[in-house]
Amino acid sequence: MLSRRTFLEIAAASGLAAHLGCSVGPPAKKRKKLAIIASIWKYLSHAQHFGDRFLVGYPRKGRWHHPEMDVVSLYVHQKPEGDQSQARADEFGFQVYPTIREALRCGGDKLAVDAVLLIIEHGDYPRNAKGQVLYPRYEFFRQVVEVFEQDGRAVPVFNDKHLSYDTAKAKKMVADSKRLGFPLLAGSSLPVTWRIPAIEFPLDCVIEEALMVGVGSSDASDYHALEAMQCMVERRRGGESGVKSVQLIQGDAVWKAGEEGRWSKRLLEAALSRSNKLLGDTLIDARPQDLANNGQLPKIVKEPAAYFIEHADGLQSTLLMLNGGVQDRTFAAKLQGEPEPQSLLFQLPPIPNVTYSACLAEKIEEMIETGEAPFPAERTLIVSGILDHCLESKVQGNRKLETPELQISYRPPEGSHFCRA
């Protein structure tokens, strides 16, 4: 039992500690410092989506969540009309620096941040003959790595979307992270957004065939669709084993390939059964449609494309880009031992809130707090390489290409990382 004298001694000590500015409880957690390296920061740019979530927070598990970290520095490569970078800096008290090195060192001579967010998406950049936007992700990443090397310290890095449009450059980025020992999280929000239904394949399941339906432009939206498909098929027996060959075909050849069985009409039916945004006759009189089987797709999809991926372990996966047929992204696969395909919709909430960005912000925050990326950068690496080689197939007359460069194997995370309702 606590005596009065002992109680008074404890109380007096506590009061003295408080008077001296000390804490008698556990020390306050030190807030992490973030540097953002961006192509642009304006309304609806990716830098705005992710940057704002670290500045003002985001919804998580029924509450408004404020990350226990601060944006302290920013570098923006371009400042077009509508630029928000300086306004955000003024409002939230961080500095916009003229170079990447200064942003990482906060104007000093040593690395002064605990993590780097590399968000090089959107902006005015040229395209090459394959239609790839030449975003300087690799070049900016290299500047970050050079600071790590010069200052003798490396911190976690998030890279938004592709690692690079060039497979060789993308490989160097992953190699640098392993050489210097810093966690690298890369990719888009598709693997972590909501799924309807909330399906996650069991690890080491046997997938017989997979098909993804995507929409949008190249090389932004086909990347999204390929990555969404990859996060599903990587959970098969043995994990990802690499890609043996790819081929991209277009136009009527896509429908002919379906008739010949190169892609599964049954899987297309299963995928489209999850779509919330069917086009064609549905827009005219609201009728339900079996677009996989009613013969309408060739009439309403003017420029179809099929991306065929032959994995090293024999799995065949296919992306169908069906602009004009649907306006959302769905997936289906046939698992061994299951009588029917499993299928789902990757749910993307609308602009301007694009809440799916919060799902990825949570994973970025997790990496910064734990020092470990929640899923491997090799997923983004292999998807970057698949897209690069599919677009090479396109410019080479849609021929099949062997891909020894894509013998990239990895194991998926054991846990499930997508948002759930």
Predicted features, each with a name:
Residues E121-P191:
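Beta-strand-loop-alpha-helix segment that lines the small-molecule cofactor/substrate pocket
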Residues M1-L2:
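N-terminal secretory signal peptides
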Residues T6-V24:
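N-terminal export signals
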Residues G214, H224-I351, A358-E378, L387-L391, ...:
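Contiguous beta-strand/loop segments that form the cofactor/metal-binding neighborhood of enzyme cores
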Residues L34, P183-R195, P202-S218, E240-D252, ...:
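NAD(P)-dependent dehydrogenases' Rossmann-like dinucleotide-binding region
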Residues C22-E91, A210:
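N-terminal Rossmann-like dinucleotide-binding module
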Residues L117:
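N-terminal Rossmann-like NAD(P) cofactor-binding module of classical short-chain dehydrogenase/reductase
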Residues Q95-A103:
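Short acidic-hydrophobic, aromatic-tinged amphipathic segments that line or gate anion-handling sites
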